């Protein structure tokens, strides 16, 4: 009887790099599409209300702001970029030439202009919370604080370049961040929402993850009946009463 050798197993086909790349791109596209849909849904609930990102230096407000605006279909504005566009000087240059007080005055003027717009994600400077009058403008929208561990923020700032940060010139980065946080913490806590960056690695959570966290927090916030009513309802007759005991406003219409 003739023995038959078993048929050789088929050799597995090798997966080309181009195929792997296509699969990865498809997965990324699906994730981006899902984030886009969720972002637009949150934007619809906000009914035009702008989002202001606040936080200490190194929290990635500019990068996160641009990505969040894209997901929501909003326009992205950056107060530092607007200041540079108007003055033709960087914030660091203005700090050096004018001092912090004058810089904050310029920053407040820019914020007052920006706060008049709707459907915007606004990335703000780290110290914008220091001026009490700025909160009147910040409260025109939803304020989201980005928060991370000091060591993570220091690594980001060092990677970006200390020379861009006028308040870091005189001492170590971590020590300075700690002092700034100590001075500003009570103001940052006034934010409507706080979103953690995470510290799983040196870079913190990826931008897409941070965007998901922001959208989730915004969705939960605006879904509350009281907040939704506040955002949507306009004043009705009788909601606002104007008193004029001295008659300085003149006769009433149709009087």
Predicted features by range, described:
Residues 58:
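Walker A (P-loop) phosphate-binding loop of P-loop NTPases
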Residues 1-20:
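N-terminal chloroplast transit peptides
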Residues 61:
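Conserved lysine of the Walker
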Residues 78-137, 178:
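ATP-dependent small-molecule kinase phosphotransfer cores
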Residues 26-45, 67, 71, 182-255:
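NTP-dependent small-molecule kinase module
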Residues 64:
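Hydrophobic positions on the alpha1 helix immediately C-terminal to the Walker A/P-loop
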Residues 53:
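Hydrophobic anchor at the beta1->P-loop junction of P-loop NTPases
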Residues 140-186:
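A glycine- and Lys/Arg-enriched "phosphate-lid" helix/loop adjacent to the NTP-binding pocket
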